[in-house]
Swiss-Prot record:
GO CC, alphabetical: cytoplasm
Protein's gene: acpS
EC number(s) given by UniProt: 2.7.8.7
Protein name as annotated: Holo-[acyl-carrier-protein] synthase
Matches recorded under NCBIfam families: acpS (TIGR00516), pantethn_trn (TIGR00556)
Species of origin: Thermodesulfovibrio yellowstonii (strain ATCC 51303 / DSM 11347 / YP87)
Primary location recorded for the protein, binned into one broad class: cytoplasm
GO BP terms: fatty acid biosynthetic process
Gene Ontology MF term list: holo-[acyl-carrier-protein] synthase activity; magnesium ion binding
One Pfam family per UniProt: ACPS
Top EC category: transferase
Cofactor requirements of the protein: Mg(2+)
Taxonomic superkingdom: Bacteria
Function (record text): Transfers the 4'-phosphopantetheine moiety from coenzyme A to a Ser of acyl-carrier-protein.
Amino acid sequence: MIEGVGVDIVAVERIKKIYEKCGEKFLNKVFTEGEISYSFSHANPFPHLAARFAVKEAVIKALKKQKGLTLKNIEVRNNSDGSPEVKIPGFNKKIFISISHEKNYAVAFVVIT
């Protein structure tokens, strides 16, 4: 049974501008060490940061603003086959995600069962 659905779109340039203004403070407030490391392993980290930000926002929408949920404790990482997955401490439901980024935008779609 589907318990929640969420979608979000993020302008890559928006994430870049926030980073240029706030730097590490922004990164450390929103992203895990793994997400930061993964994103900055690419020549242009901003599409990857934007995609992860979009997933976090879509998860929050799907969970209808569950108490105690923050952007930072929603972690997007790649599993053994390279596909993205979401990990939330203490959360046991299945989270399906789809992420895409192309030039100016990143989008994420989340289904929770």
